[in-house]
């Protein structure tokens, strides 16, 4: 397995790095939403990597090595020596199609030797919970499923995904990796701090929360925020909600919007009736430690060739100028010889624990690592 990384901007074109892996089968392009001349970029990539599938994904910030960029295209070309890949592209027009899209992905890519799926979904229409439900219920639990929801610089209005085309709205792309030669690992952690008592969801509809402990959820949330309540909905990124599963594992949910008239809160993932939840708040040190813990979960894969980092846009907003510290924590744990790429997202897809069904996450650092047997890093 060989990789190379090049960076392209509208103003300067390509950086000074030279393309060497012309026989790549896959190129991942994480791209800012304001990058212009994408047709020129697409033409250049097709010429340089004629045999590769070119997968585009818009971002809320591009990750290249140890840097966070804006309005660039971070292009990572990958040549697999012994691993077949297969790609499924599907269009989604309405949120209600999310589960059927997941089923279609699973049916298209399922095979006896399927080792892993990496999903890049548009990030505003798709209900990530139902998307992963459709996938989970139609592939073996031994298949690792990871990925993320495209970003749009924190606007939550329209994201763009594509394969062998200029990225466009309403597209989901899934990549299947096959055979025994590919080794994949994952890690996902948040690092948020809980505050207040554990409460029960007493009224919700999919991703809309109405009441907690039979009381108005929005009013309760505002009481917790105090003076910060005047900054809603923007301040909500600093105070997500934690769903506590029966086994003690946690899912973090970002608040996307509030409805003052209905007293409701809309989240970036489902909030099931009867679930136990707790409010959370930002702690800079814990967020950075969470990134390091996500990297530590990948320890089973020694010196991976490639690491794809998908971190939530909310983490970037909270960490501000300290955001690169979470990248430093990951690199220190995994190693400097690994090639790193990724993006800041509207949601992350990863199992909660090793080799259990994948789930939608918010506000996490999610890492997927790859290597082929026999890879030796320079």
Language-model features: where?
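Small-residue-enriched flexible segments
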Residues: 1-48, 52-53, 57-320, 324-335, ...
